[in-house]
Design a protein with these regions (language model features):
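Boundary at the C-terminal end of the N-terminal hydrophobic targeting segment
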Residues: 20-22
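Short aromatic-cysteine micro-motif
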Residues: 32-157, 162-188
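Surface-exposed recognition segments
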Residues: 194-271
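Bacterial N-terminal signal peptides
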Residues: 8-18
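Bacterial N-terminal signal peptides that target proteins for export
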Residues: 1-9
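Boundary/junction segments of secreted and surface-exposed precursor proteins
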Residues: 24-32
Length: 271
C-alpha cells in the first residue's frame, strides 16, 4: 500500500487511510491509528481480538453504523442501537456467509472492542471477509509478530491477570480482561485466549515441536518434522488450552476452510 509510484494514486490511498481513522503522509507510513487499534511498525493493529457482528440493512438504514465500524469508532452502544448481532459461538452463526467466503460481502464485520467475547468458529476466508468489510485486512505473520512483541511468554496462568493459556480453565475470556496480557505496543491477548489467523499460508504440519533451547512456544512451520498434503493458513499466539506452548513465537497452520473453523481460533485485523 505504501509502495505506489503514482502521486495521484498515492494521494488517493492516503485520503482513504485518513477517512478510516488512520493518517500519514501520502507516500509514507501511517502516523496515527483509530481508537480501536495500536501503532505497530508502519501500520495499525487492532487492540483486541475480533468480535464479529452481523449488521442489518448495512447499505441503507445502518450505512452510518457501517461507516463508524470502518472508521474504528463503533462502540458497543452503537452496535446495540443498530441491531447488530454478535456471531461466533457456533459455525452456523455465520450463514449465509460460507466458510469459503461466499455471500460474505456487506454481511459480517470485525470490530475491536474491550470486554466482549471474541468470535471463534470462523474460517480463514470468513475472517478475511470480515476484515475487508470493515475497511481492514488480515495482518501478515510478520506484522502480527511486531504487534505481539513484548507480550508475556507464559509460565503458569493465574486465572486473573495472566494471558489465558490454561490449560485448567479451557475457555476464552473477554477481550482485554487479562490486564497483564498486553504487548509492548498495547495490543491485548496476542498470547493465548484464541489462536489468531494471519494472512500467510504454508503446507499444514503434522507435528508442532518447540523452538529447541530458544523457546518452548509451539512451532509448526512446514518442514519442522513433516508436513501434510493440504494447505494451511497460519495461526499465531496459541490458545486457551496451550499452556507453555502459547507465546509470542507460537505458530501453527490450520485448514483455511470449515475444517479449521474451531472454537479455539479467532483473529484480529490490521490497517
Amino acid at each position: 500500500m505504501r509502495h505506489i509510484f503514482s502521486n495521484g494514486i498515492a494521494l488517493a490511498v492516503a485520503l482513504l487511510a485518513g477517512a478510516a481513522g488512520a493518517t500519514g503522509p501520502p507516500s509514507g507510513p501511517l502516523t496515527k491509528c483509530p481508537v480501536d487499534a495500536v501503532m505497530s511498525g508502519t501500520g495499525c493493529m487492532d487492540k483486541y481480538e475480533a468480535s464479529v457482528r452481523r449488521v442489518p440493512n448495512p447499505t441503507t438504514a445502518n450505512a452510518g453504523l457501517v461507516r463508524r465500524i470502518q472508521l474504528g469508532r463503533a462502540s458497543l452502544t452503537d452496535l446495540t442501537a443498530g441491531g447488530a448481532t454478535q456471531l461466533g459461538t457456533t459455525r452456523a452463526d455465520y450463514a449465509p456467509c460460507t466458510p469459503n467466503g461466499q455471500s460474505c460481502a456487506n454481511d459480517i464485520y470485525a470490530v475491536s472492542l474491550p470486554v466482549v467475547m471474541p468470535s471463534a468458529h470462523i474460517s480463514w476466508f470468513q475472517a478475511l471477509e470480515a476484515c475487508a468489510n470493515s475497511a481492514k485486512r488480515l495482518p501478515t505473520s510478520a506484522e502480527w509478530q511486531v504487534a505481539a512483541n513484548g507480550s508475556p511468554d507464559p509460565g503458569p496462568d493465574n486465572g486473573t491477570t495472566d494471558c489465558n493459556t490454561g490449560p485448567n480453565v479451557g475457555l476464552p475470556t473477554l477481550t482485554g480482561a487479562r490486564s497483564g496480557c498486553v504487548s509492548a505496543r498495547g495490543a491485548f491477548d496476542m498470547v493465548g485466549n484464541l489462536f489468531e489467523w494471519v494472512a500467510d499460508w504454508e503446507p499444514a504440519p503434522t507435528s508442532t515441536p518447540g523452538w529447541g533451547g530458544f523457546s518452548d512456544d509451539e512451532m509448526g512451520l512446514a518442514g519442522a518434522t513433516g508436513s501434510s498434503t493440504f494447505p494451511g493458513a497460519l495461526v499465531r499466539g496459541g490458545g486457551f488450552f496451550s499452556g507453555p506452548l502459547a507465546g509470542p513465537l507460537a505458530i501453527d497452520a490450520a485448514p483455511p476452510d470449515t475444517r479449521g473453523a474451531d472454537d479455539f481460533i479467532g483473529f484480529r485485523c490490521a490497517r
